[in-house]
Amino acid sequence: MSGQKLTAANLVSAIDSLKKNVNYNYVNSSNTHTIQIVHVEKPEGPIKIKRGDTETSISKQAIWRLADALSTGEPVNVDRVFGASYNFRSALEALLAHTPEIYWCKLQRIQPGLNKSEVVEGHKHIIWLPDRPHEKGVMKEYETDVVISEIPSNNVVYDALSLPSTHSEIDIDVKRRHVQIQIALSAIGFQLGFRTWIARNDQGISYGDKKIADLDGIVQKIESEKLISSFDGAVQAAMNIDCIWFRNGKLMPAVMEVEHSTGVRSGLARMKQLKDLLPPYANTRWVIVAPDEDRDKVFKEANVPMFKNLDTQYFPYSAVEELYSLCIRRKLTNKAVNEEFLDCFMEKCVM
């Protein structure tokens, strides 16, 4: 059972099974306030709760963030998942701890010192144990001798972007995130010895003090890539693909479309159009890169019969930024890891 993952829909369904308008305690016994469930929007949230006289919502995105952190039998510090700025985190933790498959636990923690480390009482965690459900509506502590050594969280920092002023404010936020992920993908590619094609329309965007087209490892003309230009219609089909990795002029490790939920099908269609114009290159991944909360949408669309031959892989934003951070911090290169290393961060979609 180890390694099983949860989705936002799983967490929402579990919380929805609890009684509404009943007072639920926090995991931290020093917090004497209580929480009530007001309304649960299925399948993935939001969840409206009441604390005292105040109503607030736990967003779909927040629920997905915690779901993505939970695996069978692995303790999770909810405070670290969200950071101190999220005031709903303890409420979400508490509600889940009242569901049968989630326990709370307190781990011993390794406290580093100047000359030696010592084991001290640690912070509260939650742990998902689907094989040993407890009574619904009550919290149950899981007794464990596990000792944890907490490593600092790693932030991903992007330079300023200068986007065209032809979008609405909401569109600009979506486009900014889209381009940030393209930047991360190109940086990953550069570290691993790939050259990266970024969609023609995005190459003129300013990132820091450079155009994207001038960043390290960027392919400025798709026409120069023989793997594409040797086949009728392929250059035009590749022109607006968000990201393509090339290696040694002989390999194409990945073709990637960066999409939000409304664009998943169109991204698959663009990749299929390109794939149908090319020979069956070995070890090319056809990848949808999308927010973590859009996983179900990606899987559903990838299994539509017309797209099944893409054998699509899903590369969530969180995994992109985890790999980006790792590449930058540890200076990973293709001498240290092979292309199969990428598959650790992606998930096969086709059933």
UniProtKB/Swiss-Prot annotation:
Tree of life domain: Bacteria
Gene Ontology MF terms in the entry: type II site-specific deoxyribonuclease activity
EC number annotated for this UniProt entry: 3.1.21.4
Enzyme kind, highest EC tier: hydrolase
Keywords for this protein: Endonuclease, Hydrolase, Nuclease, Restriction system
Endpoints of the signal sequence: none
Reactions performed catalytically: Endonucleolytic cleavage of DNA to give specific double-stranded fragments with terminal 5'-phosphates
Entry's transmembrane regions: none
One GO BP annotation of this record: DNA restriction-modification system
Known role: A P subtype restriction enzyme that recognizes the double-stranded sequence 5'-N(12)RCCGGYN(12)-3' and cleaves on both sides of the recognition sequence.
Protein name, per record: Type II restriction enzyme NmeDI
Organism: Neisseria meningitidis serogroup C
